[in-house]
Structure formats: structure tokens, C-alpha cells
Amino acid sequence: MAESRFQKRTLFLVLYLLFAILPVYWMVNMSFKTNEEILGVFSLWPQAFTWDNYKVIFTDASWYSGYINSLIYVAINTAVSLLMALPAAYAFSRYSFLGDKHVFFWLLTNRMTPPAVFLLPFFQLYTTLGLMDTHIAVALAHLLFNVPLAVWILEGFMSGVPREIDETAYIDGYSFPRFFLTIFIPLIKAGVGVAAFFCFMFSWVELLMARTLTSVNAKPIVATMTRTVSASGMDWGVLAAAGVLTIVPGAIVIWFVRNYIAKGFAMGRV
């Protein structure tokens, strides 16, 4: 009985891994093929191995600038989201005030709202202020979604820190900024890592706002990938290569914060 159960679990695990890995493998496989081979021959690996698709990405400014633009506004958004979320999460975790639960619920409601709901207001506002097609436009728009999520994650980690630590620091003569930066934040560095990861990933993959609020100068890679149709048709090989390179930053970030994410799952905040 135990052996049969183990075999079933192993089978389900193998099937799940195949289901999860197959699309990634197929994209990598396509990235090393020519368009003719992609459209004409079914093969599990490239018959005519080529790096040309990746050469296009690294030499064509319309492609590699998309990665640069994405990194710029993702870095801005992640940093600003954490700077805004840290004091807010501390207030929710340490103080009770009139309407605190309602404010917290309102924050989470913003996070659960589809980006399309806010698209028209952002478009009109940025057009009026002259912020269209700028990195700051996308970064600020994503704050509406990342700050509530970061507050929710950080509040859970901060609530797990005993209040006695705050009181002891104040008795020892620590000012609040010094206590918060040198004592409190190191205690919740796992939460900061988890919050930064989710802020990064949302901004990195979000398409609707990034595509609508930019056109040329600040167009991110996710928007660039939706505009690959030329007179000769869809360039599938280049699109696959762009997809592979788009996965790489997320994979690197996951590698560095994997332990923090596991801790977040254990605390029920991820």
C-alpha cells in the first residue's frame, strides 16, 4: 500500500514537472531555430542551430532598449514601493486607530482591482501632465498595486516582532529613525525580500499599463514583444529569444530570495 502510494505521488510529480517545464523548454528550443524550421518542421531540438535570434535582440536598439526601460522603471517602482510600505506597515502592526481595519481593507481592494479600471484616469492624467512615454509614468502607475501588496506582506512580518524590542530601544535612547533602520528592518529582512520580489515581478510582467502609457522612449520589453509583426509576418524565433531573456531576471531574483519566500509561506503571508 505504501509503495503504491509512493508510485502515485511520483507519477503526479513527474507529470506536474513536465507540464510546468515543457512550455519553457519549447520556447528555448524555438529561440535557436529559424522561422522556416519553426513553421515547417516539427522537432524536439533545433536541426539547424542558430544564434541569429539572440543577435537581433542584442544589436537592435528597438529590442535591447526594451530591457533597459523595464529595468529602470521596475527598479524605481520597487524602491519607492518599499519606502512607502515600510512605515505604513509599521503603523498597522503597532498602532490601533479609528478606521484602521477599513483603511487596510481599502488598500487590499486596490490591489485586487484589475489594472484596466485605472487605465483611463492614468492616461488622461499623464497626458495633461506631460508624463506619457516616460519611465516615471509606469513606475507611479504600478505603485497603486505594489504598495498595498507590500504593506500586507510586511505587516505580517512586523506583527511577529515582539513590541518589547521597540520599548527597549526607546529606553536605551534610540530615536525612531535609528531604531527603525538599524534594529527593526534587519529583523524583518525576510519580509523586505519577499515584498521586493513580488513588487519586482508585478512590474516586470505587467503589460496593459506598460503598453498603453508608453510608445517609443520608455517602451518596456513586454510591450515590445507584442509588436513583432513585420511585412514578412511574425518573427517567431526572435520572439522566443526575447521570451527566454525576459525569464532570466525573474529566475535570478527567485534564486536569491527563495529562502525568504519559503519563510513567507510559513508565516501565511505569501
Where are the predicted features?
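A structural signal for multi-pass alpha-helical bundles of membrane permease subunits
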Residues: 5-270
